[in-house]
Amino acid sequence: MLLREVTEDDLAIFFAQQQDPAANWMAAFTAKDPADWAAFAAKWAKIFGDRTNTTKTIVWDGCVAGSIGSFIAPWSGQREVTYWVGRNFWGRGVATCALTEFVGELVERPLYARVAEDNLASLRVLEKCGFLVIGREKGFANARRTEIEELVLELR
């Protein structure tokens, strides 16, 4: 597993991964329209333009498996981590390996993460990496077109 800088070529892969209905359902808090390239490109332009963001491409067995990053959440002012792994890489420990390495590179603590309450796979990844549930909130999940429970986790 390798974490490297995101390249323009990676974006097409990330966009294709974002089209997966099962992945969208699990992630829940996704783009309004996962098929909207213009919105996707604008989001990534914003990510690239914000020097407080740290974003990496996850490479597994020589293939782009997904992305991982951290950002200052506008709703809390705290650093949050986020990741997306393509479905063809699920169940291989990719997310756990990537998150372990990524949080090891970040010196800032505490770190926060959010996950749909019923996304047990992602919750397990976060817990394996030392994150603890510290709260819950309700939020509108675009992928489900309804408000759902979201867990807030912290890594000290």
Locate the predicted segments by residue:
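Acyl-donor (CoA/ACP) binding surface of acyl/acetyltransferases
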Residues: 1-24, 55-156
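Short, P/G- and charge-enriched loop/turn segments at secondary-structure junctions
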Residues: 43-46, 140-141
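Juxtamembrane/interface motifs at transmembrane-helix termini
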Residues: 33-36, 45-46, 86-87, 118-119
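Short loop/turn motifs at secondary-structure junctions and domain boundaries
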Residues: 46-52
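Conserved GNAT-fold acetyl-CoA-binding loop/helix
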Residues: 22-43
